[in-house]
Amino acid sequence: MTDLQTPPQDIIRGVRPAQRAVNATLQSDGVNLVLDAVSEEEETDLLALVDAGRWDCSLSRRVQHYGHRFAYSTKTCVPVAEPPPPAFTRLAERIRPVCWGADGGRDGDLQCTVNEYLPGQGISPHIDAHGAFGDGLVAVTLGAGCAIRLQRNRRHEAGAPIHTLWLPPRSALVLSGAARYVYTHGIVSRKGDLVDGEWRLRGRRVSLTFRRLPPPGPCACGFPESCDASGTAPKLLPTRLRGSAGGAEPPGCDAKKTVCASRVGVNIPGGPNKYKT
């Protein structure tokens, strides 16, 4: 088993160390990291609530959608029958001032996606579709921590630096302004992260991602060069759909279990055995 303090060099070679603090560049572009956004007790309750729900197993990892879900075929949000649970809306309201402002948002526009990341799973760098969601997104980390990769869209800014930020348990990552509309965000598919000079094996991480629907009318993001709604930029979406799934659950997947059988011992394409930055 890999030692946490002295991992083999062939594993960590090329892995970018994760920073604990948001640097000045990220801060000015709209990145904020709220530590201890939820208490340990609240984290336990939220995880129990999530695991009592029904998982969608049609993607490369398990997800749940509340309020609305993103439709990959039309690149828009469509309503779902189940609204966000009261515990989710209370959490979103608590975070509202730091992301959307005290008066931000409209009744019924809150969308929440629950993502489960098992060790070795990740998500490719992407920008949330401008036409589907408004400014400001919040990702609350439950369970294990993880490193996230942030970078300005290289299509318009060649050589833009890569920022790797450590998301500790119970933290809330806030992306607004340029960080939401111009930066790609993603999680490298690997089984550990380099933090404080130590190789930290990943555990099960559950992310609660809160977004709001955009106001009616054309996108007013203010970043036309990166706008996939009213501008010319292509949609930088995560490559996480199963090519032949057709929305069906993969064999061995039980939507009510904590871990799908189809996930155990499976090498996700480009995933568990890849340790690149």
Q: Model-derived features: where do they sit?
A:
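Non-heme Fe(II) oxygenase metal-center motifs and adjacent flexible, charged/small-residue loops
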Residues: 1-260, 265, 270-277
